[in-house]
A protein has these predicted regions:
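Intervening/peripheral non-core polypeptide segments
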Residues: 1-2, 281-285
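Accessory carbohydrate-recognition regions in carbohydrate-active enzymes
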Residues: 22-283
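Bacterial Sec-dependent N-terminal signal peptides
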Residues: 1-26
Length: 285
């Protein structure tokens, strides 16, 4: 029996610039009638080329790139394991989200932040546990797609000059969209989130230290909107470890704490937000 699945569309805008309602990524041209149909975005994505196959417009401020360089020993390379920095490596296999705002072909630990990840089942905000292997990669100018085997989720992303667009196709059941502000390629830390509504958050993330320049630091501002109203929303934050008696009464010490009822601003070095959905069969949005 064919399984009917539901698609959520969201728009991720940089510098608080929103380019309209989130829509579907452009259809791919299969007859090679345009010169861009001969472009292979995977060129340079391995052997220290440090390019990436993500979606970006020419001279665009937003790029949406698969982030597969952390979280698993099964990867060929890890972002912190050698003198090598890129949000994407072709031979790696473990996906922990889509990074927004990236450098391609540079090789310095900068940007590669605002990690957006779809998951299913019980909510888990630890990237080492919620990451997934993937298959069926496709990329063309302005478009990227893959299939997360852990969750049976198809992911698709595209970009406008100032915003990113993502479409996640979930199976029936509980599903989540996670925004991780604690991890990324940059060596800088610190972020703030504010919930505007059940379907929208805005915030700021500190980036910088380009090519090991510790004072080259700057903030970026963003807005994230989901098209469908979630069944639940919340934050998370990594708690400091405690010792002795203090540790006995705080079950979240040293772990990721979920904030399920707190709705005001939140800030920290390792924070994030989630949107949860109840995916139904045959219901389109």
């Amino acid at each position: 029996m064919k399984r009917i699945i539901l698609t959520y569309t969201l728009a991720f805008s940089l510098l608080s610039a929103y380019a309209g309602e989130g829509g579907s990524p452009p259809l791919k041209n299969t007859d090679k009638s345009l010169l861009i149909d001969y472009v292979d975005p995977f060129i340079g994505t391995t052997n220290f080329g440090t390019t990436n196959p993500g979606a970006i417009c020419p001279n665009g401020m937003m790029s949406v790139v698969p982030f597969n360089v952390m979280g698993s020993s099964e990867n060929t390379y890890d972002k912190d394991a050698r003198w090598w920095s890129t949000p994407y490596e072709y031979t790696n296999c473990f996906f922990t989200g889509y990074a927004h705002v990236n450098l391609s072909g540079v090789g310095c630990p900068e940007l590669g932040s605002l990690l957006l990840m779809p998951t299913t089942g019980e909510l888990n905000v630890d990237y080492k546990e919620y990451g997934s292997k993937y298959k069926d990669e496709q990329a063309s100018p302005g478009y990227y797609s893959n299939y997360l085997t852990k969750y049976n989720v198809k992911t698709e992303v595209s970009a406008t000059p100032r915003s990113g667009i993502a479409r996640f196709t979930f199976p029936k059941g509980k599903s989540h969209i996670l925004l991780n502000l604690g991890e990324g390629l940059t060596n800088e830390s610190g972020a703030m989130l504010r919930r505007v509504s059940d379907s929208e958050v805005e915030g700021v993330k500190l980036l910088g230290t380009f090519c090991y320049n510790p004072q080259a630091v700057f903030p970026i501002y963003f807005v994230l909107r989901v098209k469908k109203n979630p069944s639940a929303t919340g934050y998370w934050k990594k708690q400091r470890p405690m010792m002795g008696v203090e540790a006995e009464w705080d079950k979240d010490q040293g772990k990721y704490k979920l904030y399920t009822r707190y709705g005001k601003e939140i800030a920290g070095d390792d924070i994030g937000t989630y949107f949860s959905f109840d995916t139904e069969i045959g219901r389109a949005h």
